[in-house]
Amino acid sequence: MAKMKIHELAKELGVDNNVIVNFLQSKGSEVKSYRNNIEEKEIDLVRGKFKGSVSSNEPKSIDNGKASRVEKPEKNNSVTAKADQTPSEPVVHKQRPMTAQGERKNMSEQNVTTGSTESEDNIQSVGDRKYQHTDRRPQGNNGEGPQTSTNSGDRRPQGQGSYGDRRPQGQNSGDRRPYNGDRPQGQNSGDRRPYNGDRPQGQNSGDRRPYNGDRPQGQGNYGDRRPQGQNSGDRRPYNGDRPQGQGNYGDRRPQGQGSYGDRRPNSGDRPQGQGNYGDRRPQGQGSYGDRRPQGQGSYGDRPQGQGSYGDRPQGQGSYGDRRPQGQGSYGDRRPQGQGSYGDRPQGQGSYGDRRPQGQGSYGDRPQGQGNYGDRRPGGQGSYGDRRPQGQGSYGDRPQGQGNFGDRRPQGQGGYGGRPQGQGSYGGRPQGQGGYAGRSQGQGSFGGFNKDFDKDKDSGYTRSFDKKRTDPKSGEKSSIKSDLANELTKEQRAAAFNDKSRDRDRNRDRGRNNVEDGNIKSAKGKKDPNRKGAFIMPKPQQSLEKQDEIKTVIIPEVLTIKELADKMKVVPSVVVKKLFLAGKMVSINSEITFEEAEEIALGYEIIAEKEVLVNKVEELLKEDDEDENLMVKRPPVVCVMGHVDHGKTSLLDAIREANVTSREAGGITQHIGAYTVEVNGEKITFLDTPGHEAFTSMRMRGAKSTDIAILVVAADDGVMPQTVEAISHAKAAGVQIIVAINKIDKPSANIERVKQELTEHELIAEDWGGDTIFVPVSAHTKEGIDQLLEMIILTAEMGELKANPDRMARGIVIEAELDKGRGTVATILVQKGTLHVGDNIVIGSTYGKVRAMMDDKGRRVKEATPSTPVEILGLNAVPNAGEIFMATENEKEARNIADAFISQGKERLLADTKAKLSLDGLFSQIQAGNIKELNLIVKADVQGSVEAVKQSLVKLSNEEVAVRIIHGGVGAINESDVMLASTSNAIIIGFNVRPDNMAREIAEREKVDLRLYRVIYSAIEDVEAAMKGMLDPTFEEKVMGHAEVRQVFKASGLGTIAGSYVLDGKIVRGCSARITREGTQIFEGALASLKRFKDDVKEVNTGYECGLVFEKFNDIQEYDLVELYMMVEVPR
């Protein structure tokens, strides 16, 4: 056996090329790709390995053959017996290369003269790899034989067809020249020159010239098996009768459109656009040659769809006319998937020409028109000659029309060749192959490729002496083309000339194809998609030429140098540009984002404002909890209200403890956290201060709780801090329960309290609202049980849940620095469980939990959700109200703390920058007369530090600004005193004492050190200190009025005004204003006051006196004198 290409063997066996290549390589063969030839020994080795996969579907194919045979065997009985023989004896074709060069030569004579099975056998043998009727595909082919008789030439998994392509939807036969002997059920032979014998049940022969016999049921012909009426495989339709659009040989569409050649209702009656031989359209219109949307056309030319062979209802095409709306033809295939002799995935291509645009023909046709021979741009044509009008005759073609063998180099396939996987006579992978496969799809039935198919990779090149040579294998075969015999010398010459013209046309088109980036190359070069092909990199010029839009991210304020660096330009260029625009700047000048954006646009750069990501928020962000892991937790209740309204006393009554007696001044100055058990249910209470100084504490309390109890005294009613507490609770989205306290007092008025709270949208339930009001008395413990029941009921309605099996997370209620224990933080666990030994981070502080104590001071090992505990082990005092998190390890805690610290530094730096701006500096210079009171605040707990700082800062006014230069937790120490001495500050200690060393230094350095236990006192003293710093203010005080009665002149004294005191009294050293007839003529000091000749200190009303004014002597009688003094006004 001769050599064979791997891909041909792969098609035969129905396996992937690479599988065989890999198999051979594993056996030590030197094959490199599926295009390599392999020896007979290797072929047998591969067949032995993969033969099982080929024969696996045989029964199915046989069944198909039989099934299609049983339908209606009553017509065309002349050849029934012979047709029945063929499928009943399936020929399993072992694939072998082209043998018996003379077999095909005499095939047509045998076909014409005899209808014997010998002819059938002849076709089968010729069909070895090149001319087989059936393409073997795993999808259940409807070939004549069983499925094992694979077509050695065409093997495409996608069912790209060739003459011998079989597809699940009705494949055709693989032989080009069908022996149209008797076939059951419309199987067509693949021979071009059909023996148009009778066929039962409308089977079509494969002959080009239609035998217009009747066909019932329109079953498809030779190679076409489609469920809905497939076509036969011969170009000339056997235009038998077909109902319901079953197609024939060439048309392969599931909807049964189109038949081989002529589709007319008269051709054999076909209702509703059933096609025939050549037309492949989804609607079934179309014809052999030209397909127009209206489907006119003819064997020659037919206007308006009138048929020649038979009439066509509107829209069925004819043999000759084909239009470019994607209708396929024998030759015309479009990307819309129209089928062809060999149907292909893109549907383009034809028997001969396959182009990406879907043109194609038996020979060559531009723009998708196709006919048997030459196809013209208009797509019209007839069986033989297709002209724009579609006239033509069967044989004669003037004007260079193509013939059976005219093929173009532009990747058009011949009988077989197709680029991109279209099938061929003996189909080749990726479209190679003509008669025996041509690379790049050139190939023809017997194309006159003497001058044009010179590509060394061409397949069997058909020349004028009708010999073909395979340059790869060296085999030669001289198979005479029956159709070529029919052509006269003149016709060949005309076709040859026409090919020359078309070649030029196609060259241009091919050039366009390359420019458009199409896969197919202009000269029919090798398929660029083949394995191992060199892929030319695409030019990147267009990308390079595009101006890339740059984007820079800039902050709110930046210097010109920073902007220039971000834009990657020289700073001096930016300065120069601004200078030319009239702006005097330097590279260190600061500009706003808007100005920077304008500058950047001048350089075609888009500026985007920098969005500061809050690292802290990102770190504190947490995922949603799984509902299945949630368990019920105790409610956290916050007691809020105005100072002295009885919040702590109410808690005492609930806890049956006495807390108030321990609070300085009887008012609460810390947040107290307690756990109370009521009827087996735990409730966590937070007691917040009611004094106005503790606003932030109340806010923290509201944020960390589920229910807020608003305590309002029945005798006092709604007070300022009550309103503030309502605001905090609403802002935190907390359910409010109003406890009206002190109802045991005689002056208690519950209804007035309800009315006042209505103004703040708290309406009692008995007034039609939804707020729970509970009258209680902390003193007599009246209403306490009812209040607790309401708390538990509200908590149940809220369905309070938390996941205890996770890392702990919560809020810091209070923090302090204990002399013996170090930093102590009171925290409320909100999620998870906190254990002793856990690493935690609170803002910028972190540490390991060394010990935990509950609200009663007992050591505990763990704290579950809604449990308040005190923890030890932090490296610094955290700020109250911050969130704490337990972490996996200390390193993670340290990283989070560092993020907090760095963010705090950035914020401080930004504040400092803002303060040091020129505008700020100028305003400070202007306000140089403002005095500052520097304070250092030390307190026992962090919450108190905040409260004192906020209260004192509020005291600032236009003349004296209170400045807290340091605030901290713990006792007053040496460093605090030194800082106060340096900055001339007053130290305020709240519930703390100075140590001995600090006290000595304070006395030595004369540092004012004030200690307080009640916040009221601290505020009052600071107010007094501020007043002492204020500049004194004076106002005018009128002493009395006098009238000048007589004027005296005295040497050495000047003019003396003898005056009478009208009211008040005149005192020495006062000032005077003199008015004459309503006009003030003098204002100045009184130089001398005498009564008669004696100097006196004062003169009362009704007495006379002498007045001398400084540097004023122009006094006249009856002038009015007003005397006043400037008196200091206390502040």
From Swiss-Prot:
It is found in: Cytoplasm. Residues 632-801 form the tr-type G domain. Gene3D superfamilies: 1.10.10.2480, P-loop containing nucleotide triphosphate hydrolases, Translation factors, Translation initiation factor IF- 2, domain 3. Pfam families: EF-G_D2, GTP_EFTU, IF-2, IF2_N. Residues 76-88, 108-125, 139-152 have a biased composition (Polar residues). Residues 777-779 are annotated as: G5. Residues 641-648 are annotated as: G1. One of its GO terms (cellular component) is cytosol. Residues 687-690 are annotated as: G3. PROSITE patterns: G_TR_2 (PS51722), IF2 (PS01176). GO terms for molecular function: GTP binding; GTPase activity; translation initiation factor activity. The keyword Zinc does not apply. Residues 49-542 are annotated as: Disordered. One of the essential components for the initiation of protein synthesis. Protects formylmethionyl-tRNA from spontaneous hydrolysis and promotes its binding to the 30S ribosomal subunits. Also involved in the hydrolysis of GTP during the formation of the 70S ribosomal complex. NCBIfam families: IF-2 (TIGR00487), small_GTP (TIGR00231). This is Translation initiation factor IF-2. It comes from Lachnoclostridium phytofermentans (strain ATCC 700394 / DSM 18823 / ISDg). The gene is infB.
